[in-house]
Amino acid sequence: YGFSMELIKNVKDVIITPLTKLINLCIQNKTFPKCLKTGIVIPVFKKGEINDKSNYRPISLLPVFSKILEKVLCIQLTKFFEDNKILVKNQFGFRKGCSTSDALLSFIDQISEVFESGNYCIATYLDLTKAFDLVSHETLIRKLYVYNIHPDSCRIISSFLTERFQRVSLKGTTSSDLPVSRGVPQGSVLGPLLFLIFFNDFPIELNENNVILFADDTTISTTDKNCYEILTRNQRAISKASDWLCSNGLALNEGKSVNMLFSLKKSPNLANLTLLPNIQTTTRFLGITIDDKLLWKEHGVILAKQLSKNTFMLRSLANQVSQEVLKIAFSSLIQCFLRYGILIWGHASCRHYLFSIQRRAIRIVAGLPY
């Protein structure tokens, strides 16, 4: 908030020298300016009952000059962690060259190996409660020192995190400032990287298991030939994960965490596996519906409903906008949904029906009979 980024870009030649001096002074003094540490939170309605506050998503706006200074710090900190290969390979979130598709491919490759070897695999999808908002500043700074970050850098990051405030703005009314004592600042440039650093040692605690991370989306997989042994190993892994989360001040929502058993064996003896809480045959993971046999039927059904709905929207637009606008709408309403994760599910039988919906949408854009 404050000045727009467009305005800053237009006057960059005028302000570049004083702005550079200010940024260098902040770095030399190991201090993040107090005037840049107040966020404006705007509640954005999602869906459901309009008077239910849980149906609103808080969007935090920060001063534009805060983001410029953060970007300078973020570039240097990222370079240090990437050059020294400190960030674990299990983490796919907020990293250059990594995406949700990479995380999904890594997970599916592992399940495919389980199927080929005739083993069992229990995948536990952990639901963390407000992980970004519960990060302990003291613990994070301690971890920066452990990773040999220079004390001066630790001080300015500590200054960035502490003595922060936020105010809520809604329909022209603004609340008083409230202190923020935990968490990485929402809407910040530096926040996502600091969360990755905070969470970086989590997979190390579970070295016997395969851990896939996309920021705070966490999946722990346990593989074994014996259906009794796998339960013991899975429970041991979840216990370790819970201990790590507790010691780091984070909370696990056990009621929303999901367990899935992957196996191609026809009649496995699963008597003990009934002890697993919330065991399901399908679940939603990084925008893809995964089933325990990797047949993708459920994903195909959900995607077909979405594409059919969007095709109807496209047809409603056809007589009201130009073909160029229709092409843009086709890209956002059809193609982006169809392409997402297609490397994973594209071989499944559901693709034929999904592509037929796409053909109908193409005919609408081309002005051909539906």
Residue ranges of predicted features:
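Catalytic palm active-site di-aspartate
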Residues: T38-V41, R57, Q91, R95, ...
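A glycine-rich phosphate-binding loop feature that marks nucleotide/adenosyl-phosphate handling sites
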Residues: I40, N253-K265, S331, R351, ...
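Active-site palm subdomain of RNA-directed nucleic acid polymerases
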Residues: L73-Q91, P192-T222
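Hydrophobic packing residues in well-ordered alpha-helices of helical domains and bundles
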Residues: L104, V211, L231-N234, I238, ...
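Short, conserved micro-motifs composed of acidic
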Residues: R236, L250-T283
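Basic, alpha-helical interaction scaffolds
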Residues: P277-I344
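A terminal-accessory region detector
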Residues: S349-Y370
